Amino acid sequence: MQYFDVARILTTHGLHGEVKVNVITDFPEDRFAEGMQLELKDDIDRVLTIKKSRPFKQFWLLQFDEITDIDEAEKLRGKILVISEKDRGELPDGVYYYKDIFDCGVIDNETGKRLGKITDIQSPGANDIWLVHEDNGKEYWIPNIADVVKKIDIADKKVYVELMEGLRDED
């Protein structure tokens, strides 16, 4: 079974087993909902059930049914929380998990020519940007906007694009 990272436990918070986590998901409200079960990446058999959760600055605070004091919580420091593929859930049409976009071939929508592959994704503002790595070693960022990204074919691992002038160095 495949597992997906949703948070990294940074530190304890308070005396009753609460932990502060760095979020690694676009869906923290769903992933950290009361009753949701998470597992530890390095100990998949250990299930932790969310007792309560809340946003805290740029982090989240989580409390688990199974962790009741600071000493138990301290042992979780640095651990990665994951969900199984079955718990990942379905996304609406046109919305994709990052892992599905990584390593997709980038294809010129007009010519059908392969331009490279997506090797990184960043979320700096209103839309994501994707790093295209060409076979010749050149790299450039493209925005994930309708004017540029024309079609995403997850089954074939291909993204069809129409590059605006200036996005790709032609020298």
Swiss-Prot record:
Its main location: cytoplasm. GO terms for molecular function: ribosome binding. The keyword Chaperone applies. Keywords: Chaperone, Cytoplasm, Ribosome biogenesis, rRNA processing. Residues 93-167 form the PRC barrel domain. GO terms for biological process: ribosomal small subunit biogenesis; rRNA processing. It is found in: Cytoplasm. Pfam families: PRC_RimM, RimM. SUPFAM superfamilies: PRC-barrel domain (SSF50346), Translation proteins (SSF50447). GO terms for cellular component: cytoplasm; ribosome. Belongs to the RimM family. An accessory protein needed during the final step in the assembly of 30S ribosomal subunit, possibly for assembly of the head region. Essential for efficient processing of 16S rRNA. May be needed both before and after RbfA during the maturation of 16S rRNA. It has affinity for free ribosomal 30S subunits but not for 70S ribosomes. The PRC barrel domain binds ribosomal protein uS19. Binds ribosomal protein uS19. This is Ribosome maturation factor RimM. It comes from Lactobacillus acidophilus (strain ATCC 700396 / NCK56 / N2 / NCFM).
